[in-house]
Structure formats: structure tokens, C-alpha cells
Amino acid sequence: MKTEIHYGKAAVSTYRTYATPLRVTPIPESPFTGRENIIMGAAIDVRVLGESFLAAYTGGDNRLVVATDTMKNFIHRESLAFDGPTLEGWLFFIGRRFLETYPHMERLEMSGREAPFLAARVPDGDSGGWRDSAVLFDRGHGDHGTAVVALDRTGDGAIVATEVHSGRADLEMIKVSGSSFAQFARDAYTTLPERTDRPLYVHLDIGWRYADPMIAITPDAARYVASEQVADLAATVFDGFVSLSIQHLVHEIGQRALARWPQLTEISFEAQNRLWDLSHTSDSDERVKVYTDPRPPFGRIGLVLRRD
């Protein structure tokens, strides 16, 4: 009988204060150039892989089992020593410390979902202007960065990142005009009308991989692709591009992203069509409408673009 096991701890809420600031290379499609990382927050998962813990499954032998509560404490304690500016670097640091501390762990996977805290805007003294507070922050509940880092041991005992996958999740964008969906296949089952100019509301997750995974991990972030910049590039394309479908839209975003960041080798999309249902239209101005949330089910669109 063959076995494949894993175990770990999920959604370990971790908030590190006064981490290393992030500074990234500016791009035309985004105002984002970095963040101070006064609060660097994430929900972190650790998943341990390998056969070292098989005895716990087959015979209840727990002598090698690192309790998942211990894993939670480990993540919190070791995060104090992390000195990098990126989520990917944080996950790699914690994963490497796990493998260094517990030699019987063969390999593992770390994943994280950013918990963004945005500096509150406060009056700038008597100048009449505004500034970012250095002590007050608003918890963001919208789109956020994500990352997955897989770590393994080499034959000579070195600990390496075998996979790094970065992302921006839970984007929700609506464009009130400048999108269409027409000339699609029609048959006896089709009831959807063609729309040459329609609102388009999409929920979107974007992921990407680097040709060199260490770009996302090393403290030097000059070639790092910030998830905020990816979100802004997607919004810039959506704003100016007349799309003929969601498929058309995500393909254009992907092409633009790969052209902007040659250090990326792949970009992927998972999109949902969440266009509102129309309730009422004004008799005097057809632009004035009332909508409501759509009923399920929702259309899903996926795309992966990889360089040759």
C-alpha cells in the first residue's frame, strides 16, 4: 500500500510590527512604489510533507510529531527575527527555520494571505494638507497579496525553495461601459441576449511565477513584482481596453503584465462574471439604472500564459 501524508497548521494570524520597508521599481500603470511595513500581517499556513510521520498514522506513534500548536508558536516566535520586506521572503524564512530546527521534516509548503493595514490619512499640522499616519492604520478587507513557497532538502543537505507562486486575490472590479459580449454560439438552449456595450463586473484572482524564484525571496526588491502593482496594471488595462469577453480581457492583462515584467515566466487568472441583474431603467436617461446582485450560478473563466 502506498501512502501520501501531510499535516500542519492553517490560518495562523501573525502581525509583525516595524518590519523592513518595501521599495520596488515604479511602473507607469501604478502609483505604488513601496510600503513602510510598520504592520506586516498575514494568515500563514504550514503543511509538512513526507513519510517521517507515517508511524503516527499507522501505529499511533507520536514521538516524532511536532504538535500543530507548537507550529503556531514557532511561526510567531521566528517571525520576530525576519528582516525581509516581502511575504514570499517571510514564508521562506519560516519554512527554512522549520527544516533547520526539525531534521526529520523532509519537506514542507508555506502559504500566506496578506492582512493589509493601510495608513490612515490625518491632517498635516497647520499646513492644511494631509499625510499618512505613522501610528494609525485601517485594516483592509478587499483584495490582498498571496504567496506559496515550497521548500525541500538537496542531496548535500541544503534547504532550497523548489517553488514560489505569488498572487493577488479577491479583486472585484466593475466597468459601467466599454465592454461587450456578442456573436457567441447560439442554439436551442441559448437565451442570453447579445450586448455590444454592457457593464462588466468581474471577481478576479491573479497568480504569477518568476523565472528565478529567489527574486521574490531576497531582501533586494529591485526586481520584485508587488501584488499592488499587478492589481493596478489590471485596473489600467480594464479601464482603457474595449473587451469582447472576459476571456479577451484577462488575455490582454496577461500579455501586458508579461511585457511589463520580463522576470516573470507565467501569469494565471481565475475570473468570475458577477454582472448585476438589471432591475429598472430611467425613462428619461437610459444611463440611469438600478441593479441588484445576480443569482447563482456564475460563469468562471481561467487562463494561464507561459513564456516559450
Protein language model annotation of sequence segments:
Residues M1-D308:
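N-terminal intrinsically disordered, cationic/polar leader segments
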